[in-house]
Amino acid sequence: MERDENTRRLDFLREVWRLAKPYFVSEDRKAAWLLLAVVIGLNLFSVYLSVRFNFWRNDFYNTLQQYNVHGFWVQIGIFTLLAVIAIVTGVYQTYLQQMLQIRWRRWLTHRYLGHWLDDKTYYRLQLTSGTTDNPDQRISQDIDLFTSVTLSLTVGGAGFLNSVVTLFSFLTILWSLSGSLAVPLGSLGTFTIPGYLFWFALVYAIGGTWVTFKIGRPLVTLNFAQQRYEADFRFSLVRLRENTENVALYGGEPRERTIFTDRFGHVVDNFWAIMRRIKIINWWTYFYTQFAIIFPYLVTAPRYLTHAIELGGLMQTADAFGQVQTSLSFLINSYTDIAQWQAVVQRLGGFEQRMQALSQEARGKQPIDVERGGQGLSVSHLDLDRPDGVALLRDVNLKAGPGEAVLVTGPTGIGKSTLLRAISGIWPYGKGAIRLAIGKLLFLPQRPYLPLGTLRQALIYPRAETDLPETRLAEAMEKVGLAGFIPRLDEDDNWAQRLSLGEQQRLSFARVLLTEPDLLFLDEATSALDEANEAKLYRMLRGAAWHPTIVSIGHRSTLAALHDAQHDISVFRASSAPVTTP
């Protein structure tokens, strides 16, 4: 059992190093190592100042005991100088540590955002729901906690490095001041303990650490769960904000309140469990800390009362004992932070490993072979499955020649949208061959995506900038029936809520006019429009000068007249696939 525990600790430290190492070998490594070296240097200097304050206590209290007025003011002057230096050291140690933290967080955030967005990993993550919850929370919060807690626990003012250096710095002082303790053993004589205060501090701290570790272990699991519950609750609030109109039209406030209450209930219940566990830990740590104040005086008083040491020696010894005991009690004083750190490392490490695995899958040979070449579209012997392995479609064959318009129909839920996902290369479940013409591709979903920002940025999405003239943008808006919005192109707003679904679909057709794709895929992209405007937009595309190949998904019977061919893919339905009949 002990060996398994040690193995887990080593695995945890390896995981911390695996997460931390990339930054310190990155392009920002020079600044990272310089800041780290300065922070460590200030940390070591602060320990030196603690040693100087320890010797000052000896001189100061001896001066008081001797009623030396001149010596008193000299010691006050020395203290003032040491205090000023300590203040400057503490301020810059914290400031430079925070500078390192924000640079590290910035680099990690860019790195994780890159992993999340590259190879459409964000999409594959949501297909395998349950394996990695709330990736947004892991990027925004867990990275922040990882950098701040790692630096705090390792090189911070009360971190591991400070504790180790403080321990060895005061060991010699404590050993030399404590003398020997003679323990009578009756007829066996006397047993002498050299440097007995050091051994008392060691036993005191090790015993306290062992007890704290035993009663605090469940905090790791509880902190891990708390972060997940907090993220789930926050996500439900964001979902309401993004769908305010739909909820209002449904009158869904009671249901939303139930969802919020249930999710927040998990937050509260788990927090109560954390509170109860911390209460148990605090009973022990508060007792341990308070008794540590008087303990060195109890064990040092015999030497002072027998005039073996002066008052200054007593105070110096008590301070040295406190420094050794505090440094040895690092795990006790930091256990809550360590538990949170372990939870963050687990979440962040699992998230990174999952992203890397999905990225490797995406870059490997895909069972659905999507190639660019030839003309139009060709789908050959394509099988499509759901993420859980349930078969959707089998042996799909579909063709669309250059400039042709093909309509794909079928019952709801049969896999029409999944077919378009496979053609776009983002659906990994299945096998077969898809050949696409070389040229621009554009996919229009039923509900267009409108990014945050101005209406102009929504119009040219996914491009961040464009050199298209203003007249070209206005012409596209006018052709799709959005001329009234032309004066508002540079207005920054939440356009996904300001525009109706029909207006959003018109805007997506304006994107088509600006992009001029060779292959255009429409997934019920006109479902919110009336039949007359739907026909108008389709005729506009069919008559476009660049003659795009069009593949549409739709249910309206009027769409057939706007296409050259129609394919009902229900003939490819797998026997095990459940279908909802419209």
Summary of predicted features, one role per range:
Residues G216, V220, A231, N246-G252, ...:
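Cytosolic ends of transmembrane helices, especially the final helix of ABC transmembrane type-1 domains
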Residues T131, Q346, E352-L407, G430-A437, ...:
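Primarily ABC-family ATPase nucleotide-binding module
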Residues M1-S50, D59-F79, Q93, Q97, ...:
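Membrane-integrated ABC transporters
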Residues V38-G41, F45, N54, G159-S187, ...:
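A hydrophobic transmembrane-helix motif
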Residues P448-N494:
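Conserved "ABC signature" C-loop
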Residues M1-K21, I102-T147, R228-N270, Q342-M355:
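Extended non-transmembrane interhelical loops and adjacent amphipathic helices
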Residues D28-S50, Q66-R106, L127, S187-R217, ...:
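Transmembrane-helix motif of ABC transporter permease domains
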Residues A422, A458, E491-P582:
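ABC-family ATPase nucleotide-binding domain "signature/switch" substructure
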